[in-house]
Amino acid sequence: MQEIILPDNIKPALEWVNNRILQKVSPERKHGLAQSRFCGALDDWAVANGAGTAVPEWRFQVQPPGEIRRTLVPDVAFLSYERMPQSEQERIALPTIAPDAVVEVLSRDDGSRDVEEKIRVYLAAGTNVVFVVDPDERTVRVCDSDGQSVLGEEDDVAHRSLPGLRFPVRTLFASPPQRSL
């Protein structure tokens, strides 16, 4: 077997992790907030630098060397124009390369084995960095080929593969201010 093909018309999306099908879970508020904030920061950086595309829930077919091609749907993905030109990104609905950067936001239904397997697969398939956001602990784990580190609320999100991207971890978890109407 060389490829696992999953239906792409099912919502929430399906992924192939640890030799089984997993259906993504609709996020709770804190998950959705962290996901949208991270995607917004990454997209603002990508647009300002003409660097590529940052999209939530973008389906990819990834294949680490010597393994089967499988579907993964990161909470946020960034794909550079360097690795896939803009015209190709606009034309292809399902990229068959790993994203440059991935954000996975933990939810209560995520199994740690499954999260670790996704990190392994992304990095083995060519992803430069995987950010694992934990809304309960209010941390961001940064995983790359050199290992991993954990950022707290007082730290900034940044990575050498995304030059110029920098924002405070705490912004991922802060509620918007309430205004009187």
Language-model features: where?
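Gly/Pro/Ser/Thr-rich low-complexity, intrinsically disordered segments predominantly at protein N-termini
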Residues: 1-181
